[in-house]
Amino acid sequence: MSAYIRDAVRTVRGKARPDGGLAALRPHELIGTLVEALDQRTDGAAHRAGGLILGTVGQVGAQGANVALVSKLHAGLPEDGFAFSLNNCCASGLTAVGQASRMVQTGGPDILAGGVEMMSRVRFMADRADYYADASFPPRTRYIPVALAADRLAEDLGVTRVELDAAALTSQQRTAAAEGTPLVASRIPVNGLDREEPARASTSAESLAALEPAFAALSDPYAEALEGRRIDHRHTVGHAPPM
């Protein structure tokens, strides 16, 4: 049996801080908004789905206790449908969609799948896992911050600072150019916010070039995980996901 994506929607992106455009809401409310939007676009198909799978990294606080189940109840999805959350770090949402696809291909029902992460509500590393800082872990199994890993990978692959700046500038330019086009047709306004709040349309090659590498201070705290390796730090806040 084949699996198909009938439709896809997402909320507009808000800044990950207490005064961000979406911060007054809760994760299950965002999912509820998307379920309603899907219903409007698919003649009620969302409420005929047999289950909901959500990928979520920070499964504590507002995103704890199986946020997929909370979202299902909030959205009024069928009582006999399943709901579960999974964590595959930054690939959680994609993993949820992949899992849904495999379930459909093996004879399962139509499924709603995606991800939710509200960093204005649940901060990065909020689960305080031992993996992040426990010195008893062998060095090769230690956590290395994503920014530090990116610097190491850029050095290993020979990605220059100029290339990083160019990629960041292209990303910002594409974001700005997409406004008002079919490229954002899947985006759902929420709470009066109808544009990507973290976007930096004023970004220029000159402003990126003026930024200093931002993550060198992470090297010493994670020296053991790096097994003594010294890294040529290249990434700046201009290359990082805007939050």
PLM feature spans:
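Conserved active-site "lid/cap" helical segment
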Residues: 1-75, 79-85, 90, 152-161, ...
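Short glycine-aspartate micro-motif
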Residues: 3-6, 109-113, 243
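Conserved catalytic cysteine-centered active-site region
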Residues: 25, 56-109, 127-128, 141-148, ...
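Active-site-proximal alpha-helical scaffold in enzymes
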Residues: 87-116, 154-183
